[in-house]
Each structure stands twice: as C-alpha cells, then as structure tokens.
C-alpha cells in the first residue's frame, strides 16, 4: 500500500489527475473503474483540462462506474449517469458505448446486477479502480457488514449515507433508499486501486483503513489484502497516519 500525501484538496486532485493521466497514456485501452461524489470532482476537471490542452485521448478507454441509484431515470439531474456526463464524459472523447453504469430503472434489478458483473468480466476486468471512502469505511455503497465476497448487488442505503448525499437533492425525502453497487469482491478484482480522501472528517477512516483490523464491519479494511493500492490524501485526512517521505 503506497501513501501519497497532498497539501490540500486541490493538490490531492492534481496528484490524482497526474496519476490517472500517466496510466491512460501508458495504456490507451485501459479499463477504468470510476467513482462519483465530491472527492473526485476536481480530478475530473483536471482530466478535462489535460484532454483539451495536451490531447490525452479516451477514445479507446472503457469505464465502469461503481454504482447508481435505484429509481432515478438516467437523465435525472441526481443520477450518477448525469453526474458522470456533466463531470467528465461530455467533455472528453470517450465513446458512449464504452462508458458503463448500472441501470437504476431496470425491470429486473437482480438480473441487472448479474448483467453488470458479467459485463465487467467480458471486458477483461478493471485495470484501475478509483475509490473514495466513507466515514464509516464504506466503499462504493458497500456499507459496514457487507460480505467481502459480494459481487454487484442491490443495497439499502443507510440513513447516514442518505443524509451525506442529501446536499445534492432538494430534500432528504428525495434521496433514493436503494442503489446498485459493485460488490467488495468486484472492487478487489481490479488489478490496481486508487483511493482518494480529503479533509479531517476522513482522518479516522483512513487510520482504520491502514492500521485497523481487516473486518467486514469496516469495508475499506479489505484493501489491506490488495497487492496494488495507492492512497492519495491530503494532510487533514492523513493527520492520524504517519507518512514516510514520498
């Protein structure tokens, strides 16, 4: 597990973007696992700037997103489909047919979970998975207690997760109660993982991720078992972790 310390959120975003760009330039056909939310948003802006300025191409890149809300049409302003298109896809040269998200309005959600998991395998698996981390250790929408052996599945969102995401909605009542998420085993199947964290609210979670017991009560702890994990986090998030010079 490699830890890279950033000065602050913008520096974390820059280091993450540079990390991603290097991977894409080295392998133009890379398959990326992508995350949503506030943590990677600035990184996506920097990827767009690099694409426009330096011409880094996504034409042969394939992407799979971690999750999607159940019950939101993909064109709903708060769907992760819309988030990804506004934050990244609409501004780079990725092909629509190469950018995958779970279908939150599928007629059969169990079948959709199986389809999505199979699709990842058919495409050769994920080369680099981007993750954030929740204060309770969740990765994707995999909340505490999720089996480490889980594949893509339906999850009931906890009150704390819904409250954390309510800022994107008009009211807490509008936040969906369920989502489709890649499972913990799905995430662990990625060849390489990049985890981003920023702010003092993530300090306890990062400490537990790095130094805590590997246990399903703290989903991110499973990353200790992965051979290729890079953490890029700012000083506030790393305040409880001793970081050697990088």
Swiss-Prot record:
UniProt GO cellular component terms: cytoplasm
Active site annotated at which positions? Answer: 67, 136, 138, 143
The family database entries (SUPFAM superfamilies) matched by this protein are listed as: NagB/RpiA/CoA transferase-like
Biological processes, Gene Ontology terms? carbohydrate metabolic process; glucosamine catabolic process; N-acetylglucosamine catabolic process; N-acetylneuraminate catabolic process
Q: Which reaction does it catalyse?
A: alpha-D-glucosamine 6-phosphate + H2O = beta-D-fructose 6-phosphate + NH4(+)
Task: Tell me the pathway.
Answer: Amino-sugar metabolism; N-acetylneuraminate degradation; D-fructose 6-phosphate from N-acetylneuraminate: step 5/5
Q: Give the E.C. number(s).
A: 3.5.99.6
| Gene3D superfamilies xrefs | 3.40.50.1360
From the UniProt record, which GO molecular function terms apply?
glucosamine-6-phosphate deaminase activity; identical protein binding
UniProt cross-references to Pfam families, sorted A to Z = Glucosamine_iso
> What enzyme category does the UniProt record give?
hydrolase
Annotated keywords: Carbohydrate metabolism, Hydrolase
Highest taxon, organism lineage: Bacteria
Q: Report the function annotation for this chain.
A: Catalyzes the reversible isomerization-deamination of glucosamine 6-phosphate (GlcN6P) to form fructose 6-phosphate (Fru6P) and ammonium ion.
Similarity-based family:
Belongs to the glucosamine/galactosamine-6-phosphate isomerase family. NagB subfamily.
* Name this protein carries in UniProt: Glucosamine-6-phosphate deaminase
Species per Swiss-Prot/TrEMBL record: Halalkalibacterium halodurans (strain ATCC BAA-125 / DSM 18197 / FERM 7344 / JCM 9153 / C-125) (Bacillus halodurans)
């Amino acid at each position: 597990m490699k830890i890279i310390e950033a000065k602050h959120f913008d520096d974390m975003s820059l280091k993450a973007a540079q990390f991603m760009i290097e991977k894409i330039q080295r392998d133009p056909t890379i398959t990326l696992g992508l995350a949503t939310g506030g943590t990677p948003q600035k990184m996506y802006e920097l990827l767009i700037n690099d694409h426009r300025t330096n011409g880094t191409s996504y034409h042969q890149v394939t992407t799979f997103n971690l999750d999607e809300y159940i019950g939101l049409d993909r064109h709903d302003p708060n769907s992760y489909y819309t988030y990804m298109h506004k934050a990244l896809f609409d501004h780079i040269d990725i092909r629509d047919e190469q950018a995958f998200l779970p279908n939150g309005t599928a007629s059969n959600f169990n079948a959709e979970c199986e389809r999505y998991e199979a699709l990842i395998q058919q495409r050769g698996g994920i080369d680099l998975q981007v993750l954030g981390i929740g204060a309770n250790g969740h990765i994707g929408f995999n909340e505490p207690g999720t089996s480490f052996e889980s594949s893509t599945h339906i999850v009931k969102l906890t009150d704390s997760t819904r409250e954390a995401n309510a800022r994107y909605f008009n009211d807490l009542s509008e936040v969906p109660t369920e989502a489709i998420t890649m499972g913990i085993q799905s995430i662990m199947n990625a060849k390489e993982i990049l985890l981003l964290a920023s702010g003092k609210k993530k300090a306890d979670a990062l400490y537990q991720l790095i130094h805590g017991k590997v246990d399903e009560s703290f989903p991110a702890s499973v990353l200790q078992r992965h051979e290729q994990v890079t953490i890029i986090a700012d000083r506030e998030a790393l305040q409880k972790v001793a970081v050697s010079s990088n």
